[in-house]
Amino acid sequence: MIKLVLVDLDGTLTEDRESTRIDLDAIYAIRLLQKSGIKVSLVSGNSYPILRGLYTYLYLDGGFVAENGCIVFYKEKYRMCRQMEQSLVDEFKSLFKLRDTWQNEYRECDFGFVPAKITDEMINWAKERNLYIKSSGYAVHIAYNPAGKRIGVEKLLQLLGLKKEDVAAIGDSSTDIELFQQVGFKVAVGNADDELKDIADYITSNKSGKGVREFVDKLLKGEFDGIK
């Protein structure tokens, strides 16, 4: 039985992958889950202040994971990754002629840069320094993080006292692959990256936030074999 749904933010809860506007159908879907007794958590690469604000104003109850797994919140804040030295941030940005994302000012462990394209040279640079590097499609992220979103989701499930089999997740990006590794039922929205669709248990016909609504409607109607 599903007791928790983990929802990515950009490209999943929003109207589409190019928008920062939260989809109203997705908000309605969250309310339907909560009314049925299923908790909802956000899992995102966004910074802690962004997730904390959304968590409060969307009136969520299942905690959240920020900075691609590096920050977890449930009743209190937990830092799962070592903080990044500013000298490394500056070196990476300067060497590859990148720009800070606007959220870097508020980040602690996982930093994002644009353009969002990763090169072999970037991968080698990160590997030499034992850094995680990945593109979300919105930015290139670097952090002292061995497991991406998985490290934060593991902690959150521990805090909530839930097993992998109790949890479903919905996302759109290759950064959600690590998220999918920690849940029992995996959903990719219709406009998700192909590599995420390849491992999904269900792919919505609708994109982004409308896909969230589609999944929730089917879940609550009991249309997925083996889960309720």
From Swiss-Prot:
Membrane-crossing residue ranges in chain numbering: none
Sequence positions that bind Mg(2+): 8, 10, 172, 176
Example of a GO cellular component annotation carried by this entry: cytosol
EC number(s) from the headed UniProt entry: 3.1.3.18
Gene Ontology molecular-function annotations: magnesium ion binding; phosphatase activity; phosphoglycolate phosphatase activity
Reaction(s) catalysed by this chain's protein: 2-phosphoglycolate + H2O = glycolate + phosphate
Cofactor section: Mg(2+)
Annotated Gene3D superfamilies: 3.90.1070.10, HAD superfamily/HAD-like
Superkingdom of the source species: Archaea
Positions of substrate binding: 149
Annotated catalytic residues: 8 (nucleophile)
Keyword vocabulary terms for this entry: Carbohydrate metabolism, Hydrolase, Magnesium, Metal-binding
HAMAP family noted in UniProt: GPH_hydrolase_arch
Role noted for this protein: Catalyzes the dephosphorylation of 2-phosphoglycolate.
Family: Belongs to the archaeal SPP-like hydrolase family.
NCBIfam families, alphabetized: Pglycolate_arch, SPP-subfamily
Protein's name according to its UniProt entry: Phosphoglycolate phosphatase 1
Organism: Saccharolobus solfataricus (strain ATCC 35092 / DSM 1617 / JCM 11322 / P2) (Sulfolobus solfataricus)
